[in-house]
UniProtKB/Swiss-Prot annotation:
InterPro entries: CDK, CDK7, Kinase-like_dom_sf, Prot_kinase_dom, Protein_kinase_ATP_BS, Ser/Thr_kinase_AS
Gene name as annotated: CDKD-1
Organism: Oryza sativa subsp. indica
Keyword Chaperone: no
GO terms, biological process: positive regulation of transcription by RNA polymerase II
Induction: By gibberellic acid (GA3) and submergence.
Protein name, as recorded: Cyclin-dependent kinase D-1
CDD domains attached to this UniProt entry: STKc_CDK7 (cd07841)
Positions of the catalytic residues: D141
Cell compartments where the protein resides: Nucleus
Catalytic activity: L-seryl-[protein] + ATP = O-phospho-L-seryl-[protein] + ADP + H(+); L-threonyl-[protein] + ATP = O-phospho-L-threonyl-[protein] + ADP + H(+); [DNA-directed RNA polymerase] + ATP = phospho-[DNA-directed RNA polymerase] + ADP + H(+)
Length: 424
């Protein structure tokens, strides 16, 4: 990889000139992603241009972490980092170009996913996770738009900016990772000591999202997110999760019994439901691992996973079609009944009881910070594999990301490697 060491500006410029930038693919807090042509190989690549900013902001450390980890993570289900070089005050990361992502597949109403298609996507996701965990790497930002899909249909884990080496039981990490809808309950309860089980919970949420064609648990706050989880799987008992009551931000919730998993995913196979239940196990110590999940009978039973090259994919960008997805989740969260800084007992809001959506008003699938638009008529609904109105209500919430407050906290508290000059 190009480094520009020794003040070799001409050498760095030659590396930069190798790539001919085309259109912008996306823009984030720290930089821009371009589509580009590699004049040396003739391949199309994606270049992430990162604004390095001031040293104290820590942006460059996040990029260095991603570079370091991706140099070690060479696998067919993990995005390939081709090159990295500084140029004109920015750090450029060159990745293999991927046509789309799993979120686009989920949102595209013109795509019909068969059970074999879903199985294929989940298998590739778990293969990537299993490789990361084998190398003692936590991803910590699993969500559909970080699962990229290439022209050959291959799914690959991407965006390792929050990834972390794990393994030491005494090592503390920040719990402000993952977008909220994909956070495991132990993270929502404030644990700072965790392992690969947090990635598995998020993978379970993605599995559920593929089955439902919409985000599964859409909390508007951490407490509300826990309420959504407990409404779906029941309030955990100490016998299920002995360490729960010792977590830093533990909140006692009113007991709610778990509805049958079949009622949430009526179209899923028995094997799929069994795997989901193991991925959504409350106690992280008992939660299934990625390798164990790959060996689960779900992947051995018929139908066999679809070959990646035969998977349906969304149309090119700009030809979005009708990709609006109904969303039946309730934004209101459970109510905290007792004062702060004491053991808080939380009960489910009465709005989490039966509260069905009007037939002529469905909401657009949330993405980023966009507001939701009403769909035109009942005929524009897509078939849902679960009637969740009785559990989750009706009002949509915007898809969460790591917001500015989260990022500010991460800048102060990210547990960086000592070699990057950043310690906690």
């Amino acid at each position: 990889m190009a480094s520009g060491d020794g003040g070799d500006d001409a050498g760095v410029k030659r590396v930069a000139d190798r790539y001919l930038k085309r259109e912008v693919l996306g823009e984030g807090t720290y930089g821009v992603v371009f589509k580009a042509d590699d004049t040396k190989t003739g391949n199309t690549v994606a270049i992430k241009k990162i604004r390095l900013g001031k040293y104290k902001e820590g942006v460059n450390f996040t990029a260095l972490r991603e570079i370091k980890l991706l140099k070690e993570l060479k696998d067919s289900n993990i995005i390939e980092l081709i090159d990295a070089f500084p140029y004109k005050g920015n750090l450029h990361l060159v990745f293999e170009f991927m046509e789309t992502d799993l979120e686009a597949v989920i949102r595209d109403r013109n795509i019909v996913l068969s059970p074999a298609d879903t199985k294929s996507y989940i298998q590739m996701m778990l293969k990537g996770l299993a490789f990361c965990h084998k190398k003692w790497v936590l991803h910590r930002d699993m969500k559909p738009n970080n699962l990229l899909i290439g022209a050959d249909g291959q799914l690959k884990l991407a965006d390792f900016g929050l990834a972390r080496i794990f393994g030491s039981p005494e090592r503390n990490f920040t719990h402000q990772v993952f977008a909220r809808w994909y956070r495991a309950p132990e993270l929502l309860f404030g644990t700072k000591q965790y392992g690969s089980a947090v990635d598995i919970w998020a993978a379970g949420c993605i599995f559920a999202e593929l089955l439902l064609r919409r985000p599964f648990l859409q909390g508007s706050s951490d407490i509300d997110q826990l309420g959504k989880i407990f409404a779906a799987f029941g309030t955990p008992k100490s016998s299920q999760w002995p360490d729960m009551v010792y977590l830093p931000d533990y909140v006692e919730y009113q007991f709610v019994s778990a509805p049958p998993l079949r009622s949430l995913f009526p179209m899923a196979s028995d094997d799929a439901l069994d795997l989901l239940s193991r991925m959504f196990t409350y106690d992280p110590k008992a939660r299934i691992t990625a390798q164990q999940a790959l060996e689960h009978r779900y992947f051995l039973s018929v139908p066999a996973p679809t070959k990646p090259s035969q998977l349906p994919r969304p149309p090119p960008k700009g030809d979005s079609g009708n990709n609006k997805i109904p969303d039946l989740n309730l934004q209101d969260g459970p109510v905290v009944l007792s004062p702060p800084r004491k053991l808080r007992r939380v009960t489910a809001h009465e709005g989490m009881e039966v509260h069905m959506h009007r037939a002529d008003r469905t909401e657009e699938h949330p993405s980023g910070a966009r507001h939701m638009d009403d769909m035109s008529s009942q005929s524009s609904r897509i078939p849902m594999s679960v009637d969740v109105g009785a559990i989750f209500g009706t009002r949509p919430a915007p898809r969460p990301t790591l917001n500015s407050a989260d990022k500010s906290r991460l800048k102060r508290k990210l547990d960086m490697d000592p070699e990057f000059g950043y310690t906690e």
